[in-house]
């Protein structure tokens, strides 16, 4: 029988962490080391953001005329970003985010914290938050800058959350778009680094995740 449980899926790496800036820094270093390939923000937005790593890199590699293989580079760049997230995640769970999670969970709404961090640092970072109605979901998305639409769906399925009764908490415009493609409503956390992206379609827009934004989300879910 299909789940009817209400839930919230938080893409921690972009909605809480400043993942967009971290990813840009990682990509810039990686491409420079790979073949002295430059990367600036307009180029990142034009060729990489909101696409699979492989598709975006293949498009950009044609422009810069490198002989490097996009498929291999995509795997390496995704792994490098996951490693960078793993390094900072244990220091990134602020009291305001704890309040966001516990406020929602206290109302019986499931909270799924999604991250690409490695198992050990993820467990260390989130263990104090894994109370009743809160779970951790790990997946390295093949998309640059946001989860792919089916990542949202898998996070719901793995944690017995009904997509029709769930809201995705995204940290970018492309995250909002992928949530829509997954058939989910979304709350967008507006980050200065990607504020230029299109947030059309977000059901809610907030500046951070806190007890106050949790109450807005609960009101939207009619809890």
Located regions from the model:
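Asp-based, Mg2+/Mn2+-dependent phosphohydrolase catalytic module
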Residues: 1-5, 118-223
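N-terminal helical cap/lid subdomain that shapes the substrate entry/recognition surface
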Residues: 3-95
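Structured helix-beta-strand junction loops
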Residues: 51, 107-108, 201
């Amino acid at each position: 029988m299909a789940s009817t449980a209400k839930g919230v899926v938080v893409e921690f790496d972009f909605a809480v962490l400043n993942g967009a800036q971290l990813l840009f820094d990682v990509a810039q270093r990686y491409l420079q080391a790979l073949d002295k390939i430059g990367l600036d923000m307009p180029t990142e937005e034009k060729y990489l953001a909101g696409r699979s790593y492989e598709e975006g890199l293949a498009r950009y590699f044609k422009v810069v005329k490198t002989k490097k293989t996009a498929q291999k580079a995509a795997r390496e760049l995704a792994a490098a970003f996951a490693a960078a997230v793993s390094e900072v995640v244990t220091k990134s769970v602020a009291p305001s985010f704890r309040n966001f999670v516990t406020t929602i969970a206290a109302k019986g709404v499931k909270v799924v914290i999604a991250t690409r961090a490695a198992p050990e640092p993820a467990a260390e970072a989130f263990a104090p938050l894994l109370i009743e109605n809160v779970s951790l979901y790990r997946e390295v998305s093949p998309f640059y800058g946001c989860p792919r639409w089916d990542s949202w769906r898998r996070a719901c399925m793995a944690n017995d959350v009904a997509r029709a009764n769930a809201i995705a908490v995204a940290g970018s415009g492309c995250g909002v778009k992928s949530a829509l493609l997954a058939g989910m409503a979304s709350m967008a956390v507006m980050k200065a680094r990607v504020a230029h992206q299109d947030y059309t379609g977000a059901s809610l827009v907030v500046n951070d995740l806190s007890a106050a934004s949790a109450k807005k989300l609960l009101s939207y879910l009619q809890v």
